[in-house]
Structure formats: C-alpha cells, structure tokens
Amino acid sequence: MPTTLYFVRHGVTDWNAARRLAGRLAGVSLSGDGRREAEAVARRLAAVPLRAVVSSPLDRARETAETIARPHELRVVVDEAFQEREYAAWQGLFSSDIHARFPDDVRAVAGGQTVAGVESVASMAERMWAGMERLAAEHPDGAVAVVSHADPIRALIARVASVPPERLRAITIDTASVSRIRRRGPRAIVDYANSRAHLEGPGACGWPSPQQSGAV
C-alpha cells in the first residue's frame, strides 16, 4: 500500500483578499473566512485515518494544520521543507506594486526562469519532494496531511506530473484546497489537485475530481 499525502493550502488571510504578498513574513494569520475554510477541510479529512499532520512554520499554515489535527488528537509537526516560497524584495508588497516595480522579473518568474532573490521552481520542487520522501518513510502505508502554500504545492505537483516550469501557473492551488498524492517506492501519482468540494459542493474540484478517482 502507498503512503497517501493530502497537501492542503492554508485558509485565506486578509493579505490574500487584498492581493498582498505575505511570503515568509511572520504574523500573517487566517481571517474569519480562513478559519471557516480550515474547519471545512478538517471536516473533510476527519474520516481519514491520519497518522500525522505536518505544517509549514508560518502562522497561517499552522493555524490551518491545528484545525485539521484537532479531530485526530494529533500534534502538528512543523517542517521547513513545506515552507512558503522565498520572494525576497516582493514580500509585503501588493500585487500591483510588484508588477509596477519589477515587471521584467515578474515576466521571467512567470516563464519559469530564475530571478535573483526569488526561489526557483526547481528548489521548491526539490525540498517538497524530499519532505514527501521523508514522510513516506516515516509513515509507510499511512495517510498524512501537509499544510503548505500555493507555489510549493504547485512545484511538487509539476514535478510529479512532469509539468515544465513555464507552465507552473497553469496549476491552480486555491486557499483551503486539497491535492492528493500517493507515494509508493520511487513513484508518486497525483490523484487530484485543487479540490474544494468541501467548500463549494459536489463538482467544485480540480484535476481530476475526487469522485472520479474514488478519493476523499
């Protein structure tokens, strides 16, 4: 049996709503809507026999992870492998300001190129993959929830599904979405990505639907 990993993006924050990039800045917590989103994810995963709940060290991810862990009576394990992307000078800025001040860098990053100060897709994918391998070794044949961030989850899915870096943004990872990856030996399979059926009702999911894959 494989290790089943549920990659969850944290719930929404006021910064997300304002289109402001938090990056790795401390002190950015879930909004009221974000807490409700986290509770919806927790209800969805309550029936899954999770062996561990792992989180990025950032507040918004830890709050989401703690909500998921509560029904399972598990302690959240913080792991730097699932940290947010490093955005350097972009952190704290609104999206419009980033595009105005760094237009060439924004285009380069969108095209999958490496820009000084901004973590590369390859770097994100490598640390996310290493973290996944470690969890698979620690929890063989078990289920684990991992709370992370949009670009790192995109990068991991892109590596598993052989999506080139310049197509990273084609993978949508919304707040409080669930993406399921099964890991068996050296192989990994994406069952589905960006599922939000727990928030929006049947059919509100990404690629493919959990209903199609027989998944939670």
Where are these regions (language model features)?
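Short active-site segment of divalent metal-dependent hydrolases/proteases
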Residues: 13, 152-153
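Generic structural signal for well-ordered alpha-helical scaffold segments
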Residues: 39-46, 125, 129-137, 157
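Short basic (Lys/Arg) and small-residue
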Residues: 149
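Acidic, low-complexity terminal tails and accessory targeting/binding regions
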Residues: 1-3, 85-96, 137, 142-143, ...
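Active-site-proximal alpha-helix that buttresses catalytic centers in soluble enzyme cores
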Residues: 3, 8-74, 78, 101
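Active-site signature of alpha/beta-hydrolase-fold catalytic machinery across serine-
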Residues: 67, 155-159
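Phosphate-handling substructures
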Residues: 29, 71-129, 189-195, 202-212, ...
